[in-house]
């Protein structure tokens, strides 16, 4: 993917000012999507809403967010219909579109619909993308998995904010799965549930308290990931074998499952997950550094990945 960095400004904390926090990860968009990137910048959802009109704030947020989504989706689908092989590069564009909607809705809900006069530390919340959304690989109609991370037990304010955000996102037609947990709960579940642990392996802060999200990651690596590599490898390989049996343990099927079948996207992801878990790599190119792949191997890996994403995106639209 290209080097163009373009992530919409993100609010650093629910309860603080609107300063941009440079620590938040950025999404890279390929130059093929430069015109759409410009559209992202121009269409600031919050600027299109009368924030003083409290009685219509929820409805107006929904209307303007739907307009934004419809416009961007139309542009992206036109581009993919014209050139299906741009599909791998579109994953970041779809991710960014969802990021902007979630950030905008979250800021409006937390700051204008449920303003706090005297916020406490207990009201800090981080909205964290996990799973495929966390690694910024979003096909046109992929599910969005979110972790609403709280420092302690959830407050009444937090319940209202999270519930309102979710209902607006659902009304937007987004397929959002979610969990609401504090750090200790997240660690406990990660230790006991391999699926939850895998999804947390690739988490990404979307909105909210940066320090809270950083604390989660530090403790995940210290208390969970670094102590359980052999178990993780065994579980993921066992999971792969069961998946292959279910889908038909053959490479060449008349109607293969692009995601779950043998040699499909999930197999490529499993290889990367294991490598990330063991070596704490943050980029697939690091697979060469740790001698998991040769340069030629990595090129084959990327070609296979691009091909499978091209098919999957084509099936989505």
Q: What spans do the regions from the language model cover?
A:
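A nucleotide- and high-energy phosphate-metabolite-utilizing enzyme signature
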Residues: 2-317
């Amino acid at each position: 993917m290209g080097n163009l960095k373009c992530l919409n400004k993100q609010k650093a904390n629910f309860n603080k000012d609107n300063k941009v926090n440079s620590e938040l990860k950025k999404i890279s968009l390929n130059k093929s999507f430069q015109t759409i990137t410009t559209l992202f910048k121009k269409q600031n959802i919050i600027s299109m809403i009368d924030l003083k009109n409290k009685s219509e704030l929820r409805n107006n947020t929904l209307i303007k967010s739907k307009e934004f989504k419809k416009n961007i989706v139309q542009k992206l689908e036109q581009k993919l219909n014209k050139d299906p092989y741009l599909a791998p590069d579109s994953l970041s564009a779809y991710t960014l579109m969802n990021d902007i909607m979630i950030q905008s809705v979250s800021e409006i809900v937390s700051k204008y619909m449920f303003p706090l006069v005297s916020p406490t530390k207990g009201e800090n919340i981080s909205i964290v993308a996990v799973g495929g959304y966390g690694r910024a690989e979003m096909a046109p109609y992929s599910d969005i998995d979110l972790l609403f991370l709280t420092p302690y037990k959830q407050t009444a304010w937090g319940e209202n904010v999270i519930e309102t955000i979710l209902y607006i996102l659902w009304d937007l037609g987004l397929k959002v799965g979610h969990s609401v947990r504090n750090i200790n709960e997240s660690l406990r579940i990660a230790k006991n549930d391999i699926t939850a642990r895998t999804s947390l392996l690739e988490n990404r802060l979307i909105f909210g308290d940066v320090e809270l999200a950083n604390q989660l990651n530090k403790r995940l690596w210290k208390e969970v990931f670094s102590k359980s590599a052999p178990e993780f490898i065994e579980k993921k390989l066992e999971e792969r074998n069961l998946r292959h049996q279910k889908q038909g343990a053959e490479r060449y099927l008349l109607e293969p499952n692009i995601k779950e079948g043998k040699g499909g996207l999930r197999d490529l992801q499993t290889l990367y997950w294991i490598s990330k878990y063991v070596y704490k790599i943050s980029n697939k190119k690091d697979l060469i550094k740790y001698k998991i792949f040769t340069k030629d191997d990595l090129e084959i890996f990327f070609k296979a990945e691009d091909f499978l994403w091209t098919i999957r995106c084509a099936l989505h639209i």
